[in-house]
Design a protein with these regions (language model features):
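Generic detector of contiguous secondary-structure segments
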Residues: 207-226, 256-269, 273
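Long, compositionally biased, glycine/small-hydrophobic-enriched stretches that function as flexible linkers
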Residues: 6, 10-11, 15-198
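Short, charged low-complexity linear segments at domain edges
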Residues: 227-259, 280-297
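Aromatic- and Lys/Arg-enriched surface recognition patch
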Residues: 294-308
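Short flanking/linker segments adjacent to small metal-binding domains or redox-active Cys/His motifs
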Residues: 187-219, 225, 308-343
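Short acidic, gly/pro-rich beta-turn/loop elements at beta-sheet edges
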Residues: 228, 275, 283-285, 324, ...
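Local cysteine-cluster metal-coordination motifs and their immediate loop/turn environment
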Residues: 259-283, 304-319
Length: 343
């Protein structure tokens, strides 16, 4: 299933683009609302490599078009951001190269970025292909040039298209287009990444007799050997992270008051601790009533899935090793967007 955040209340329909000089490609992208992007992603997911299938959905949940449009068309975006309790880096324009480092396809970002830029500049309104078909065409071109599996660059190509939608082609072209992970991690194969995500911690001799004292590893940055911590069986992700004192977390991100996962309340009241689950979603507890209700109010996801890819870390309890990604921002915007559409 595509990320439900793409379906956020049809917000794009309510706000036509502001008048400005744009390219035909940008005009084409502006014709597509959340529903259209959701359908596009559904089509693409069938072709995206397993290593990036979850990651691509998570990225689109982290950077919803509806929130961008709300801010873009607000009379005073800064005041609206304060009203929606937005904290951290929520604009894609500030992280064109870095927002997708958790995708395997990020390794091919320079090639993808160059190809998308060229395609955008040569785009004509007479092109009669769907958004999904155009993304697939660019990905196929990149794969052919780089001699790699096309499935590895479909997700990152879709991200490039959405990034242009939110930042504009000129800003996209101005970004350096750098790979922001080290060579050691960049050399890993998709199979290696998937294998590491699937491994559970050994519990030692006679582990089958253990019930309470099992411990699991939570990886929060697959591109950092130290980007992980251990927690107890059935301990929630946020509580386990609080015991990680390996770094000065506040210095890295003021939202991180203790541990790598930003927290405030620990009771699903603030929305600070949301995370995406790259691997091991099935090894987390089911979404309980409160988490399901609050995560919709925050605006992060609309779903009835028992174990979705977007979770509140203070509610999700570990039953095995998992790999997560921590978004660089948080807010409370679900009710606002819904009220604007219904008004």
């Amino acid at each position: 299933m595509p990320p439900d955040s793409l379906r956020l209340y049809g917000f794009a329909r309510k706000y036509p683009a502001k008048t400005m000089m744009t390219t035909p490609f940008e005009d084409f992208l502006k014709q597509h609302d959340e529903e259209s992007w959701s359908a596009t992603l559904t089509t693409l997911l069938r072709s995206i490599h397993e290593v990036d299938r979850n990651a691509t959905q998570i990225w689109f949940s982290f950077y919803p078009l509806s929130l961008f449009l709300a801010l873009e068309h607000a009379d005073d975006p800064e005041t609206l951001a304060q009203r929606l309790l937005l904290q951290g880096k929520y604009y894609l324009k500030d992280q064109i190269d870095s927002s997708h480092t958790f995708l395997y396809g990020h390794r091919y970002w320079p090639e993808v970025k160059a190809a998308v830029q060229k395609y955008a500049r040569e785009f004509s309104a007479s092109f009669n292909r769907t958004l999904a078909d155009q993304i697939l065409a660019v990905a196929k071109h990149v794969a052919g040039q780089a001699k790699l599996d096309e499935a590895l660059v479909i997700g990152i190509t879709a991200i490039a298209f959405m990034t242009i939608r939110q930042v504009g082609l000129a800003a996209f072209e101005a970004a350096p287009g750098q790979v922001l992970i080290d060579k050691k991690h960049a050399r890993k194969s998709p199979a290696e990444v998937l294998r590491e995500r699937a491994v559970d911690d050994s519990q030692g001799f006679l582990s089958f007799l253990k019930t309470i004292d099992k411990k699991w590893t939570v990886t929060y940055d697959e591109n950092d050997d130290g980007g992980k911590y251990r927690l107890n069986h059935l301990q929630d992700l946020a509580w386990g992270a609080a015991e990680d004192r390996s770094r000065n977390w506040r210095e890295l991100d003021p939202r991180r008051v203790e541990g790598p996962i930003p927290v405030e309340c620990r009771s699903a009241s603030c929305g600070t601790c949301w995370v995406g689950v790259l691997g091991g979603a099935e090894k987390l507890s089911d979404v309980a009533a409160r988490e399901g209700k609050k995560i919709k109010e925050f605006g992060y996801i609309e779903t009835v899935e028992a174990r979705p890819l977007i979770r509140l870390a203070c509610q999700a309890q570990a039953q095995g090793a998992v790999s997560i990604v921590i978004p660089p921002w948080n807010g409370v915007f679900g009710k606002y967007l819904k009220s604007r559409v219904n008004s």
